[in-house]
């Protein structure tokens, strides 16, 4: 703090990133030199929503063949990539409405608008016609399920289920959920399933603590299906339970440092890949320093939950 005149308050990435980036460079060099384990989930929220649309309206898993070879997931990722870049806001709003008010009318309207979008893409998109057929099949699947298990239960198969806060408030499409799932699974792989002595510290989340704890307990009690796409950097099959503690970030320097790191990766990738601004060379040097300890198939490093088209830009730049 004295070296960089930071004062005694809580460390804030939003201030340090632009005003004193050399702090990140020193931090990156220290982490690299000491070979400290670094696990980051870098999430494009719009891409997560697009992925949910694909999973529920285009390629729901209910009648899919064996997915363990990863081919179906590869197709899903490609569709989500395209939707992120091209789907009109109105179609997103229709999907949100179906999530918040899951009625048959809203569900079918959401699917219909998505189908209309791809029908309009047939002249320029080689997979548009197949996607339209997939949506038609999803609508048929819904009607079949409705006849078997009833309308309400069937609707819930084709929209993402909301998470519930401790007060019973519904929260739709919370990105924290997939991030905590992935982090725990990555820690499980890194520690070779021996995680009973591992404690994961998280800054207090007034509305989301309960949800994150529920996610942890779900992973610990749910048997992993063999019919899932391969995930090389994670192990979702937990034999032991880790501890998850929520702390006040003002009183925990470790959580503040984690926030600094998360803020760096978020701002760097946002500037480089999304805003496409002229990024100062020091930021490239910082990322390159972190990159030194990233290994293929390792649970350590950055998990880029962003469109593949964006991934490839940074992968080529830093030789992933």
Question: What residues fall within each predicted segment?
Answer:
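Phosphate-ester processing/binding pockets and catalytic centers
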Residues: 1-320
């Amino acid at each position: 703090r004295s070296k960089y005149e930071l004062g005694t308050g809580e460390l804030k990435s939003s201030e340090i990133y632009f005003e004193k980036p050399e702090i990140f460079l020193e931090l990156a060099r220290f982490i690299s030199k000491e070979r400290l384990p670094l696990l980051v989930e870098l999430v494009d929220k719009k891409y997560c929503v697009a992925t949910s649309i694909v999973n529920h309206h285009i390629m729901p898993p209910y009648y899919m063949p064996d997915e363990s070879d990863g081919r179906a997931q590869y197709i899903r990722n490609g569709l989500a990539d395209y939707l992120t870049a091209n789907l009109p806001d109105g179609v997103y709003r229709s999907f949100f409405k179906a999530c918040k008010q899951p009625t048959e009318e809203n569900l079918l309207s959401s699917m219909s608008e998505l189908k209309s979008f791809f029908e309009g893409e047939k002249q320029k998109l080689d997979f548009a016609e197949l996607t339209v057929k997939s949506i038609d099949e999803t609508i048929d699947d819904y009607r079949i399920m409705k006849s078997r298990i009833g309308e309400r239960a069937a609707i819930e198969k084709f929209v993402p289920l909301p998470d519930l806060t401790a007060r019973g408030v519904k929260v739709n499409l919370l990105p924290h959920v997939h991030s905590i799932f992935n982090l725990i699974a990555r820690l499980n792989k890194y520690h070779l399933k021996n995680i009973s002595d591992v404690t994961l510290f998280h800054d207090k989340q007034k509305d989301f603590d309960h949800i994150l704890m529920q996610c942890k307990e779900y992973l610990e009690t749910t048997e992993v299906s063999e019919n899932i796409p391969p995930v090389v950097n994670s192990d979702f099959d937990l034999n032991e339970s880790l501890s998850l503690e929520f702390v006040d970030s003002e009183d925990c320097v470790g959580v503040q440092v984690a926030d600094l790191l998360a803020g760096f990766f978020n701002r760097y990738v946002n500037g480089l890949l999304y805003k496409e601004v002229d990024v100062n060379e020091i930021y490239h040097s910082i990322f390159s320093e972190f990159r030194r300890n990233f290994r293929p198939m390792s649970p350590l490093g950055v998990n880029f939950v962003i469109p593949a088209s964006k991934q490839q830009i940074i992968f080529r730049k830093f030789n992933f």
